[in-house]
């Protein structure tokens, strides 16, 4: 599984639909792409049980709901450990996006950070703080977030911390990894191999670095990752599982070829 030298990947043609015959371009995302990346994510997850629980008033305050997604995309992109990619149709429309982070303190992780350059790292650090302050002030001026169930958001964050420590933090050997922070694809473009092409980007990097890939799979996304060779480490906490489809989704891991797996898959 690989991308062409110019970053393009063509879907197999099909006489049934014009969508399936369009050439798809996978490219590195820029900060200008963040708004559309956010809108794609907001649309993809709009009707999921988790979204309905966290943002019950998203229909009434749709602009705020979209802004959550856009701000998150930008915040991730301003981290020097992050790499973001978009999938575009032949017309240039962003139809999907993926964001990955190179975690750890190993030589490979620091080599990548150094390659970014000191000036760019300083710019990203300053921009991240300015953006954080801007977001705080803007939400304050609007009288706070009207889309959220604040108690649900705090509860969900606590579940994430528990699972993060259980599956990643308590396993020193998993600290050095690429982590898939987000993968979204518009519904009408799903099932055409585009998600695999986006994941191919990080799988090639992980194979080159000799490190694992970790991610949190939704109930719907678990099938894709399984086909790509990811293994399930464990389901989300019982409470989180009750919000999503019970018994589906969870923490998943991918091992590069030749990687010495852990002696135990204990969760």
Describe the residue ranges of each PLM region.
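Conserved acetyl-CoA-binding loop-helix of GNAT-fold acetyltransferases
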Residues: 185, 191-204
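Active-site rim helix/loop that mediates acceptor-substrate recognition in acyltransferases
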Residues: 56-84, 89, 163-169
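Conserved catalytic-core motifs of GNAT/GCN5-like acyltransferases
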Residues: 231-251
């Amino acid at each position: 599984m690989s991308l062409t030298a110019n970053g393009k990947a063509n879907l197999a043609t099909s006489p049934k639909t014009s969508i399936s015959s369009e050439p798809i371009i996978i490219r590195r995302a820029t900060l200008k792409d963040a708004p559309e990346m956010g809108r794609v994510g907001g649309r993809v997850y709009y009707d999921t049980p988790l979204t309905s629980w966290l943002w019950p008033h998203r229909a009434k305050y749709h602009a705020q709901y979209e802004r959550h997604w856009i701000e998150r995309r930008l915040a991730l992109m301003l981290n020097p450990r992050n790499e973001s990619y978009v999938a575009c149709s032949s017309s240039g429309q962003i139809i999907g996006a993926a964001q990955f982070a190179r975690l750890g303190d190993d030589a490979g992780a620091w080599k990548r950070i150094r390659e970014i350059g000191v000036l760019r790292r300083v710019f990203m650090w300053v921009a991240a703080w300015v953006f954080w302050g801007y977001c705080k002030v803007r939400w304050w001026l609007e009288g706070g977030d009207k889309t959220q169930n604040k108690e649900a958001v705090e509860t969900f964050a606590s579940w994430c911390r528990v699972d993060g420590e259980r599956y990643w933090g308590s396993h020193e050997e998993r600290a050095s990894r690429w982590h898939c922070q987000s993968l979204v694809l518009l519904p009408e473009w799903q099932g055409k191999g585009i998600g695999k092409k986006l994941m191919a980007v990080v799988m090639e990097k992980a194979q080159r670095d000799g490190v694992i890939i970790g991610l949190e799979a939704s109930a719907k996304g678990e099938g894709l990752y399984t086909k790509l060779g990811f293994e399930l480490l464990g389901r989300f906490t019982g409470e989180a599982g009750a919000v999503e489809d019970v018994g589906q989704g969870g923490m998943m891991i991918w091992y590069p070829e030749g990687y010495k797996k852990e002696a135990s898959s204990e969760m």
